[in-house]
Every structure is written in C-alpha cells, then in structure tokens.
C-alpha cells in the first residue's frame, strides 16, 4: 500500500538527550518497520536529524513507535522541529549517515 499512497518527506530534528541513547538505531528500526525510506545522523550540536520519506500515515506511525522505543520522550528528548523537504527519487532504504 505504501507504493500507491502519496509520499511526503519530512526532516525531523530531535533535541534533548538524544545522542548515545540509541535514537539512530531506533529510527532505522521504526522506519523500516513502517516501510519508510531516508536517513538519520548525529549532528555536531548534539541533536539528531532524520529525513523520512513515505505516507503521512507511515510518518505518524514512525513517530509514535519511536516515542515508545526510546525512553524519556517528552521528559529527556523530543521532536524539536519538523519541516517538509523535497522528495528523493529511487530511494530504497533507511540508513545511518555520518556528518
């Protein structure tokens, strides 16, 4: 169903205690579980950025799953910003990038 749904791509910036807590691994796990593509990386300023591409339903499920998989959502870490960005053609997987 993901292939027929209208795709969107969103850049999320996660803030708070997000590095060295498994956030990148959790993003990969959640995105793949929802059939989403994109990437995630640690930033030098201590945040974690992810670009996630797929249906709006998949995006919501990704965030919901992520908030339960990484302890402390709302108290120790949160979504600092989310911004629509351009779609990436022919992207097939979700992975970790380096800055």
Segments (PLM) and residue ranges:
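Intrinsically disordered, low-complexity, mixed-charge
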Residues: 1-99
């Amino acid at each position: 169903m993901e292939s027929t749904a209208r795709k969107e791509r969103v850049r999320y910036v996660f803030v708070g205690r997000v590095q060295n807590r498994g956030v990148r691994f959790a993003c990969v796990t959640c995105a793949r579980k929802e059939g989403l593509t994109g990437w995630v990386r640690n930033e030098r300023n201590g945040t974690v950025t992810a670009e996630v591409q797929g249906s709006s339903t998949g995006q919501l499920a990704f965030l919901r799953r992520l908030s339960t998989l990484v302890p402390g959502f709302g108290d120790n870490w949160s979504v600092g910003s989310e911004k629509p960005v351009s779609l990436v053609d022919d992207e097939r997987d979700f992975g970790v990038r380096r800055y």
